Structure formats: structure tokens, C-alpha cells
């Protein structure tokens, strides 16, 4: 057995993840020592990797692309947020041996936009690009902030329409998207391989904030495109990452970290 409480992030890829550094900063705030690692699970091997992790003393896990919807099905019970999202980014090991699934992505995104970037969501028009687990995970919390309108656009229109029906929002084909959006959020994973969403530069003409859910170099192609196309402000997903991580940490340990100094620490690395 491991002497320290042990946590990890599961993804494919996982080597780029900054989650270990973030959670170590939270542990410093709490005044405890923890282990936090990266686990690159094979496609098709996620459930076994999670099972092995918890059976060998794991206490909690974060889940990133492409496993968030698989994590939902793996969990034995779910929070209301996870049920609404149909996707899980946080797994909590319970004392009776069951696994609880939660979704803190929406909290991380909304807190970063409203509290760190100081842009209200209420009354705004929002465009979501992508229809995977990451996007589905943030819609319930975005709706709680009462935007005037949420539109979802995806390369595969059927997936966008499925989410639109589920959450009572609008869906349009990516190629048909025009301007008129205050906040544009990229939830596609194309940036990880340098690809841009297939949208017109015109969509950014009224944009107050263009936001990419990924961070660092992976966000650069989309944010450069948005900036050059007229977006007034751009942001990568580092603040969202720190915010969702803080909510996960609180679920595992009952300690709520202060995210602002951790965001600044991560920017300085």
C-alpha cells in the first residue's frame, strides 16, 4: 500500500497534463503531502486501468479526453451535475468500494470566465464548438448562468442536434455559423494536432471573448485565428483546468483551494 494519498489523471495523451503540478499546489495550501500522477490509458483499456488504480490504493482520479463519457458509464453512482452532463471528469473512491462520478468542468469554465476574466455570462449569446464529452459537461452550468442564447456547432451535425434537444439549446452546422456571439468556446480537440474548427472568420466579428478549453500550445491555433479575425479578448483553458481541479480536490479531500494564486503559479512555469 502507498503511504501517501494517491491521485492521478487518466487520458490519452496524458504526458502533457499539468494536473500534477496544480494538485501539488493545492496540497501545499492544505499543508499535506499527496501523490498525483499521469496515466495514459490505452484506447479500450480505460476501465481496466481505473480498476487497477483504485485496487492498488488510489483515492481519486481526474479524467480527460477521450474518456469522459466512458468514465460516466464506469461510475457506480453519479452527482446531479454528472447525470445532466452524461460525462464524468472526476472519480471518487468511496469507503464501500464503489466509485462516484462527478463533473466539475462546467464549474471550472464558468468561474474562470466570470470571476477571473470578469465577463458576465448572464444575458450573453454563447457559441459552443464541438459536441463531445467536454462540451456536454459544461452546458448544464453555463445554463445556470442564464445566457440569452446558447448555440452548438459540430462537424457532425447529428451530434450537435442531439445535445441541442437534450439541453433545450440550438444547433447549427459548423459551416453555417455566422457572427453575433459574445462568447465563443472551442471544445473540439483539434488543437492538440494543430487543426482548426471549420468555421468562418466572420463568427468572431462581435466576439467579446474567444475561449479554448485546452491550454498552452494546443490552444494557440484557435486563439490566434480568433484574435486575427476580430475577437476582442482570447483565453486558453488554464483557468478552467485549475478551477475544475480545485472542485475535484474539494470532493476528494473536503478542502477548497484558492485558484487565483495557482493560476498565476502555472502561468509562471
From Swiss-Prot:
A GO cellular-component term linked to this record: cytosol
CDD domains referenced in this protein's UniProt entry, alphabetically: NAD_bind_Shikimate_DH
EC numbers for this chain: 1.1.1.25
Chain positions recorded as NADP(+) binding sites: 80, 130-134, 154-159, 213, 237
Subunit structure: Homodimer.
Summary of the function given for this chain in its UniProt record: Involved in the biosynthesis of the chorismate, which leads to the biosynthesis of aromatic amino acids. Catalyzes the reversible NADPH linked reduction of 3-dehydroshikimate (DHSA) to yield shikimate (SA).
Record protein name field: Shikimate dehydrogenase (NADP(+))
Species per Swiss-Prot/TrEMBL record: Neisseria gonorrhoeae (strain ATCC 700825 / FA 1090)
Organism classification: Bacteria, Pseudomonadati, Pseudomonadota, Betaproteobacteria, Neisseriales
Gene field: aroE
Amino acid at each position: 500500500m502507498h503511504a501517501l494519498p494517491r491521485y492521478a489523471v487518466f487520458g490519452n495523451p496524458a504526458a502533457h497534463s499539468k494536473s500534477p503540478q496544480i494538485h501539488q499546489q493545492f496540497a501545499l495550501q492544505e499543508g499535506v503531502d499527496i501523490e498525483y500522477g499521469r496515466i495514459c490509458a490505452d484506447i479500450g483499456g480505460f476501465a481496466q486501468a481505473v480498476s487497477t488504480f483504485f485496487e492498488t490504493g488510489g483515492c481519486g482520479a481526474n479524467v480527460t479526453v477521450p474518456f469522459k463519457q466512458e468514465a460516466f458509464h464506469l461510475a457506480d453512482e453519479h452527482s446531479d451535475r454528472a447525470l445532466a452532463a452524461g460525462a464524468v471528469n472526476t472519480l471518487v473512491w468511496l469507503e464501500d468500494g464503489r466509485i462516484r462520478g462527478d463533473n466539475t468542468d462546467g464549474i471550472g469554465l464558468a468561474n474562470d470566465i466570470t470571476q477571473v476574466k470578469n465577463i458576465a455570462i448572464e444575458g450573453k449569446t454563447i457559441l459552443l464548438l464541438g459536441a463531445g464529452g467536454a462540451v456536454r459537461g459544461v452546458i448544464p452550468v453555463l445554463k445556470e448562468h442564464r445566457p440569452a442564447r446558447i448555440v452548438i456547432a459540430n462537424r457532425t451535425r447529428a451530434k450537435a442536434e442531439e445535445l441541442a434537444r437534450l439541453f433545450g439549446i440550438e444547433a447549427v452546422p459548423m459551416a453555417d455559423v455566422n457572427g453575433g456571439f459574445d462568447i465563443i468556446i472551442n471544445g473540439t480537440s483539434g488543437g492538440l494536432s494543430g487543426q482548426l474548427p471549420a468555421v468562418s472568420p466572420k463568427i468572431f466579428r462581435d466576439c467579446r471573448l474567444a475561449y479554448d478549453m485546452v491550454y498552452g500550445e494546443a490552444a494557440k491555433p484557435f486563439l490566434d485565428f480568433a484574435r486575427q479575425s476580430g475577437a476582442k479578448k482570447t483565453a486558453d483553458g488554464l483557468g478552467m483546468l485549475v478551477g475544475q481541479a480545485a472542485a475535484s480536490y474539494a470532493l476528494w479531500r473536503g478542502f477548497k483551494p484558492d485558484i487565483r494564486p495557482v493560476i498565476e503559479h502555472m502561468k509562471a512555469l
